[in-house]
């Protein structure tokens, strides 16, 4: 359950984690945001702190529905980063990620990575990020045994109530369709 996240992070010796990708069709991101039409986002959770959702400006309303603290990517001048990176998209993205992590107080320690993005993109960005922040250790986990999966296996009362509400809604829709 979400209330166990910090305990699970401590048990895995993770100081923070990052989730990349869509708000939907991305179980780790969906778990924290509740879904929504967010096509490109980054969620950063530092142990002991609430998660923060970084998003595109056009997705601010959908991001706000998550109830998380939201910061638009536009806070970081991507065009300037792109130029500074020699027009290397992967490096510019890693530079922005470095700024986001530093803003949240993450510049050293073990950082888990989750989410669904193109493998080539992910590898490139994370390789650059490791060079930009040499005091962090980027940690990957097997999908079926990850921190996020372990958290999703148990539910607190808020999560159970949400499941019940969705079950009720689904039953009503099926009944209306049948009739």
Model-identified regions with their sequence ranges:
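Flexible, acidic/His-enriched mid-domain "rim/lid" segments that flank
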Residues: 89-179
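N-terminal accessory/capping or targeting/presequence segment of soluble
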Residues: 1-99, 155, 164, 168
């Amino acid at each position: 359950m979400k209330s166990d996240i910090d305990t699970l992070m401590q048990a895995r010796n993770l100081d923070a984690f990052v989730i990349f990708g869509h708000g939907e069709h991305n179980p780790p991101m969906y778990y924290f945001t509740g879904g929504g039409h967010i096509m490109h986002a980054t969620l950063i959770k530092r142990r002991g702190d609430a998660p923060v959702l970084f998003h595109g400006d056009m997705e601010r309303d959908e991001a706000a529905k998550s109830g998380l603290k939201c910061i638009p990517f536009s806070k970081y001048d991507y065009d300037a980063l792109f130029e500074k990176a020699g027009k290397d998209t992967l490096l510019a993205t890693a530079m922005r990620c470095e700024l986001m992590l530093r803003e949240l107080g993450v510049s050293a320690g073990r950082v888990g990575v989750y989410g669904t993005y193109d493998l080539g993109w992910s590898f490139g960005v994370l390789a650059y990020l490791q060079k930009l922040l040499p005091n962090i250790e980027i940690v990957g986990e097997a999908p079926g045994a990850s921190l996020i999966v372990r958290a999703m296996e148990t539910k607190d009362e808020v999560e159970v109530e949400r499941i019940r509400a969705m079950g009720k809604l689904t039953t009503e829709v099926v009944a209306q369709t049948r009739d």
